[in-house]
Amino acid sequence: MTGEHKRSSLIKRITNETKIQIALSLDGGPVSLAQSLFKDKDYSAEHAAQATSSQFISVNTGIGFLDHMLHALAKHGGWSVIIECVGDLHIDDHHSAEDTGIALGMAFKEALGHVRGIKRFGSGFAPLDEALSRAVIDMSNRPYAVVDLGLKREKIGDLSCEMIPHVLESFAQGAHVTMHVDCLRGFNDHHRAESAFKALAIAIKEAISSNGTDDIPSTKGVLF
């Protein structure tokens, strides 16, 4: 990882089902979009937003609990990010949740660039009251995800519980990473899901941190 590479990206992903745009900086700092998808309507009361001296986070997928999870991922990963999605929520939450995961993964992959001078592997544990989750990740260029959260409810807010692991799987697909995310214990599904996203944030932050060299961390000599 060199000091000259600004680890940021700006992407748009448009299908017949969703319109998504994301501005991402993996190291925090300012981010912006040229034009919001929501220019004609004030969604400020409906999305997850936070601004500090080191981070700017604004997430609006139209699905409140998904916004909450992505806010936690960005906050504890040290990112600045704007995520906007307009999707076919009149059908259900599947396309918006899945496509947001894919698009965020794509933005992450583009922002990270060539895997050089980073640790590559990361792991993290995060508790939330009675819940405890573990995440392990590899910047491998091998998209694969094993996610076991043990959720029992049908929905949390407007997000189907079956979509929560699928969002993580979709992120892995878009980012071309290998990751294992497990909730080890807990009985509150909100806590189980949130601790999982926080654990993943911690794992990602470690994996993309500097290893003190400019080497590609692979015996193959090539990643991404």
From Swiss-Prot:
Classification via InterPro entries: IGPD_sf (IPR038494), ImidazoleglycerolP_deHydtase (IPR000807), ImidazoleglycerP_deHydtase_CS (IPR020565), Ribosomal_Su5_D2-typ_SF (IPR020568)
Any one GO MF annotation of this record: imidazoleglycerol-phosphate dehydratase activity
EC number(s) per entry: 4.2.1.19
Associated pathway: Amino-acid biosynthesis; L-histidine biosynthesis; L-histidine from 5-phospho-alpha-D-ribose 1-diphosphate: step 6/9
Taxonomic superkingdom: Eukaryota
Keywords for the protein's UniProt record, in alphabetical order: Amino-acid biosynthesis, Histidine biosynthesis, Lyase
Catalytic reactions of this protein: D-erythro-1-(imidazol-4-yl)glycerol 3-phosphate = 3-(imidazol-4-yl)-2-oxopropyl phosphate + H2O
GO biological process: L-histidine biosynthetic process
The keyword Lyase is assigned to this record: yes
Enzyme class: lyase
Similarity-based family: Belongs to the imidazoleglycerol-phosphate dehydratase family.
Protein name (Swiss-Prot/TrEMBL): Imidazoleglycerol-phosphate dehydratase
Organism: Komagataella pastoris
